[in-house]
From Swiss-Prot:
Domain of life: Eukaryota
This protein's record includes keyword Chloroplast: no
Any GO BP: acetate metabolic process
Species of provenance: Neurospora crassa (strain ATCC 24698 / 74-OR23-1A / CBS 708.71 / DSM 1257 / FGSC 987)
Catalytic activity: acetyl-CoA + H2O = acetate + CoA + H(+)
Protein's recorded name: Acetyl-CoA hydrolase
UniProt-recorded Gene Ontology molecular function terms: acetate CoA-transferase activity; acetyl-CoA hydrolase activity
Location within or outside the cell: Cytoplasm
Gene name of the record: acu-8
Amino acid sequence: MASPIASAALRARVKRPSMLKKLCNPEDMLQHFPNGAYIGWSGFTGVGYPKKVPTMLADHVEKNGLQGQLKYSLFVGASAGAETENRWAALDMIARRAPHQVGKNIAKGINEGRINFFDKHLSMFPVDLVYGYYTKDRQNKNLDVVCVEATEIKEDGSIVLGASVGATPELIQMADKVIIEVNTAIPSFDGLHDITFSDLPPNRKPYLIQQCRDRIGTTSVPVDPEKVVGIIECTTPDQTLPNSPADETATAIAGHLIEFFEHEVAHGRLPKNLLPLQSGIGNIANAVIGGLETSNFKNLNVWTEVIQDTFLDLFDSGKLDFATATSIRFSPTGFERFYKNWDNYYDKLLLRSQSVSNAPEIIRRLGVIGMNTPVEVDIYAHANSTNVMGSRMLNGLGGSADFLRNSKYSIMHTPSTRPSKTDAHGVSCIVPMCTHVDQTEHDLDVIVTENGLADVRGLSPRERARVIIDKCAHDVYKPILKAYFEKAEFECLRKGMGHEPHLLFNSFDMHKALVEEGSMAKVKF
């Protein structure tokens, strides 16, 4: 295949002329991906990920019938694009994956035992990578090759990332070889990043951040030019999907939270402009941010993982002063709006590595208000964020525990029920005992559903159970949960073991009823 010729757009983005000598076709990189290689990709929540090389490798496997014969250990800061990692999973190209993923095929591979998946707190993953934890059992202690999407290569050879940072600095730090995809379909993000690396103990330093807009790093990622084995032009934008619109349930949850914030301000526990907000992904998170737009709060700040379209509305309303994250995951129309109004948003946003955006040290110092959606919450305020029925992996822990363990306000918001195959309210999200625990009773302050808000700060386990059942459970499940709790309380207090009453032989009867009868509501204690 003939060597590619640099386009005018690529020449404008690559400011170090010697780098253009490494311009190549994706197919030229095939030699760097032997079976069993440990590889890394840039990207976080489906933006800023490499596209050309992963697609080339998938095409190669599909064309030559090599499914299951070219398999890799894949490390990405969080999830990459569905058309890359999800396709790899469908072609049986992933042997091992960490620390977070999104996609039906990759989840299927994990739950069928074909992919060894290890989820980890997102603040810890890049650090553990640099510690050598993920390469400790192989002769080569580094990653074999890392593919990175950039929007510019500067004169010194450092790279300007795109819509996410994630674990890219640490992946490059641990790479033997680096392939850079320069995306000319989107603007250069020069100046929008604050790049830091993870040092090893005993030489680690504190993150000297006291406000959301503080900078402690550089605007680009240093790369050893000797590591770079290929430069490829990419003309494909991130393939994101429209955001989920808020429904009545999400809007009701948002209303309860706004009322709670107003209550905390009135009692002097929050300033009038609140404290930095962290919000997860999904329609409830969107509804909360939308609720803030129509509230009386102003001069807000955001310290979070991912910024979505609703934050643009909050900026445009004049109520959001500054937002920092490790990723901006807009919908296609959101990105169009962002690029069109670049000058309005440019100095109000900052993207950091996930080891900083999710750093417990900073979250605790800033007093962040952390909000996330779980799979289920139990009556004592333990939460399950990952494993349905205790066994089926969804996406991974992500950064939920980074924030919920360390925020000033640790909030779990969830619908009170979800539908099963046969019952619109067949799954209660409030259960007697979580089938898997990611956040403990010691971490959470507030549980909120569309029915109400349970403030469990300072409450004993039995007090928590009563308020969670009363405020949060769906009407269908309130009598069921009360019956379980009252029976457990009676039996355990009678035996002198009633601090946190449980009947272990009944704790999962609701889950059993779901499996056997199609609805938790059909439980019989």
